[in-house]
Amino acid sequence: MGASPSWLKDMVCTPWPERDANHLLVTGSQLEDLEKTLFASGLPVEALMEKAGLAISRRLLKVLNKPDWQQLAADGIVVLVGPGHNGGDGLVVARELHLAGLAVQLWRPYPTRRPLTEAHWRHALWLGLPELPDPPDPSQPQLWVDAIFGIGQRRPPGEKVEQLLIERQRLRPGALVAIDCPTGLCADTGRRLGKGAATAAITFCLGLLKQGLIQDSALAHVGRLERIDLGLPLLPLTGLADCALGLGGRDAQSFAAWGGPSGSHWQGPPDPAASKYERGRLLVVAGSCRFRGAAHLALAGASASGCGSLQASIPVELANDLWTVLPHVVVRQGLGATETEGLDLAALELDGVERLDAVLLGPGIGLPNPKNTFSPASDASAWEQLGAFEGLLVLDADGLNRLAGQDHQQSDGALAWLRRRSGPTWLTPHQGEFARLFPHLAELPALEASLAAAQSCGATVLLKGAHSIIAAPDGRRWQLLEACPAVARAGLGDVLAGYAAGVGARARAHGGLDAQLLAAAALVHALAGCRVSHRPGPAGTEPLAVARNLAHWPAIPSPTNPARRSEGS
């Protein structure tokens, strides 16, 4: 990778959210190192296991007291005991459930390897908990507690256990909970280690969230993820410098109170004396004959951001009537577009683009022809001007696909163009668009791939998914912890792209653009989707409903830099 762009050194790095147990997303090795630090300090291994088991048993007893779970509790509990410390945690849980009056049985598929786990096993048998001589019947109604393997899983659990777990889910879905990590699932990547893995209704994650458990590939196996707080001291957590940070609902509120970058402060309401041009100037290049609605959705998202001046370069057929639905949007240019050729970027006029704070390119613009082949010369002028633009460039959808198809006269094409760009860039791909732009990274786990992409091209990357990931070139990463599958509908990404671009335009107008703003925008967008999903009927989750809901959220604060004043148009 070449020298960093000049603007990159000015990016702020104040941590948001706090790097604490509520937000850190760790790998198994990081947690093992943390445990070694705690044990070296004098904390007995026995104390941590007891603490974990007691915390899970208290939480599980509360769950089993709920109406939907009471019958499972009445039918009894089967604890699947592994050979290591995860099995020991399960035995503490089994003991406490037994002492609470529940009928608990034990089954261990492998010989016990850890002395502490063996001690808990002997004690459980002494208390009278029965050991099953054969694997439990997967069709029976008892609740299964999966304590076979936790974060240390490196290989498949074996055909016998895998088939048992598969049959359990087929015959009794929703009747298994997992301790720390479902057996057969990698806690680092979220991928299955073999042919099958436990499918949990709830996964009780001990101490810190394991990064693999919130990846898209893991969601069907993890079920509802609950972090069990173990009261870990803050000091050793500060040493986990390379962790991604999880973002939840409370973090949208805490963003407004965040101290912000040095030399500036974060404000909610805009400066009362600021003109519309000092509240962010954004150009949206979107839409085509085939995807006409994308322009409307992107502009609706941008409008919800609170940016002061919104311009559009869209198909001429849309431009003529835009005033009837979005009267505040200034039509900068009506562009030619056909069903098969997409939006004509060769005719895009960017004179005076230096006066803008941000440009969004891509939602619904289509491809140059239906076979997804590209004519490098057709868009060359637009890419040249956008490369020289010193403001924020947000690339989404077919903007990314067209970039990936350009020659750019470099051996690594699009990536070299991104590195040469004069201003900051935000990329918002879904997995397919990411694979086209970064084919060499497409098979990596999402957290690893997004960071490698950001560092290779110098852009901030928002990799969209059920739990979207935001990665900055300086190494910071965030991942959304909350999402609603009901709002995964066509057009939602257009709203997000417009909203994020508007937030970025406001920030740049105030002189304090940062990758954390893209993370905050993605979080608020996801929460708006969750909010509208509670409305009755499918219409409540339409993308325009999300955009309307975004408009009612408090504006994402923008950093104020008194030294910068933006000129008018």
For each feature predicted by the language model, list its residue ranges.
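Internal gly/pro-rich beta-alpha loop/helix module
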Residues: 141-143, 148-249
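N-terminal small/polar loop signature for handling phosphorylated ligands or for N-terminal nucleophile
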Residues: 92-171, 320, 324-336, 345-351, ...
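Small-residue (G/A/S/T)-rich helix-start motifs and N-terminal tracts that mark the onset
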Residues: 2-110, 213-394, 401-426, 431-569
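Residues immediately flanking
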Residues: 181, 206-208, 363, 397, ...
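Short acidic-hydrophobic sequence patches enriched in Asp/Glu that either
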Residues: 116, 160, 196, 491, ...
